[in-house]
A protein has these predicted regions:
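Glycine-rich phosphate-binding loop and adjoining beta1-alpha1-beta2 segment
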Residues: 2-35, 174-218
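Conserved SAM/SAH-binding loop
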Residues: 224-231
């Protein structure tokens, strides 16, 4: 959203999420690049959060909704379609917010007349089922992961960290994270990656994101080398890896490093598939070597499109254009959806739940997705620590009830509490 984000009616609202150094919601919105206003712009699409006023006369007006592990959006005009919104689960909030932005983006970009006029959502507990069904709510989480290795700290890797950083840890200092990447943050990362701001451009990705994680209270270690087939982890290293690299060679080596489990996500590429995401869990029925050898050989690279032709006219070589055209497109809201799915997979693992070896979805139409449940494997303890109890979070809140609404648009997004 090039016009930024407008947020209305949040004066004095407490911040209940662990986002240092911010203490209030207003501080967090301003610090993260939003614009706190008295009255949100009227000529932008609307996203309603909670029980706020509806303004349903807009061309685009949707409401976020959740219950437990299920989250998504429904049109404001469609009464009675909200979920129960009783059971808190951070990842369903991440998911529903990202889906709302994806719908607004498609509405503004054009090409999808259904955007904003439909129900869109997913259950992270039962992704193969209808997210509005009661059985998709899932259980209350009592344990959270305590040791993880993150491979790649770009768009997807930073989305993982954002989701992990919002989880309600009782003792975040019990969490050990290893961050592996060899690259530096570039200006393009500011618009594609959730934790990149202009102040850290030029820094090593590992160091900038480790700093963010340590402010959250996590313990970190960094590895500044490429992940490749000759890389091995030790017995004392985290047994679970989350992979977010956009590199077939590295992804094909995921099962060679010695991790007990690997959960990875990739995003779509090109103007047709930039809204796509696909997650894998290893070990699975297919080897990583076989998956990426097949996918790379079948990938179509379109350097004949106008943007690439314009670059060629300025002197760009064909080899470079081919590499650029074959890269994934970094829409941060797609990365956030993928992160919710991956971290949801991780939380099911930590709490002894079932697993899915493949989840393949597309935000143009999330109903058309492929979900493959994993075979029952050997019992596995990835390491865990206690989740904060809901009663403790409730005591941190004030008597002010936060029931907001929000607007998203080519100019801004806005957030307004009930009666604001």
């Amino acid at each position: 959203m090039l016009g930024g984000v407008e947020v209305e009616g949040i004066a004095g609202m407490p911040l209940l999420l662990p986002l240092r150094p911010y203490r209030t919601l207003e501080e967090a919105v301003s610090g993260l690049g939003g614009k706190v206003v008295r009255a949100a712009s009227r000529d932008v699409p609307l996203v309603v959060v909670g029980d706020g006023r509806e303004d349903a006369d807009r061309a685009f007006a949707v409401r976020t909704t959740f219950d437990g592990w299920a989250g998504g959006i429904v049109p404001v005009r469609a009464q009675g379609l909200r979920l129960a919104e009783r059971q808190e689960f951070i990842l369903s909030g991440v998911l529903s917010g990202a889906v709302a932005v994806a719908e607004a983006f498609q509405h503004l970009r054009g090409g999808n007349p259904a955007a904003g006029r439909r129900n869109v959502g997913l259950s992270l507990w039962r992704p193969e089922a209808d997210w509005r069904e009661p059985q998709t709510v899932g259980p209350v989480i009592t344990r959270l992961p305590s040791a993880l290795w993150l491979i790649g700290i770009g768009n997807v890797g930073q989305a993982y960290m954002w989701a992990l950083g919002l989880l309600p840890y009782e003792n975040p200092n019990e969490v050990q994270l290893v961050l592996q990447d060899y690259d530096m943050l570039a200006p393009s990362n500011d618009s594609t990656s959730l934790l990149t701001q202009p102040t850290v451009i030029g820094a090593r990705k590992t160091r900038a994101i480790a700093d963010w994680a340590e402010k959250r209270g996590f313990r970190t270690a960094i590895i500044e080398r490429r992940f490749a087939s000759d890389f091995r982890v030790g017995a004392d290293d985290p047994a679970v890896a989350l992979c977010g690299v956009d590199n077939a060679l590295a992804r094909s080596a995921l099962e060679d490093a010695g991790f007990s489990r690997v959960i990875e996500a990739g995003l779509g590429y090109g103007i047709r598939d930039y809204l796509g995401f696909r997650t894998h869990v290893f070990p699975g029925s297919r080897r990583a070597h076989d998956i990426w050898r097949t996918e790379e050989s079948g990938r179509e690279v379109r350097t004949d499109l106008p943007a690439y032709q314009a670059l060629e006219a300025t002197g760009a070589d064909q080899c470079g254009l081919t590499k650029l055209a074959g890269r994934t497109v970094g829409a941060p809201f797609v990365g956030a959806v993928a992160a919710a799915v991956v971290v949801g997979e991780l939380l099911r693992m930590v709490n002894g739940g079932h697993a899915y070896e493949l989840i393949d979805g597309h935000l143009r139409n999330l109903d058309h997705r492929t979900v493959v449940r994993a075979a029952e494997g050997q019992p596995f303890n990835p390491g865990s620590t206690e989740a904060e109890r809901a009663a403790k979070r409730d005591r941190r809140s004030t008597a002010t009830e936060f029931q907001p609404y929000a607007c998203v648009g080519a100019t801004p997004l806005a957030l307004v509490p009930n009666g604001g």
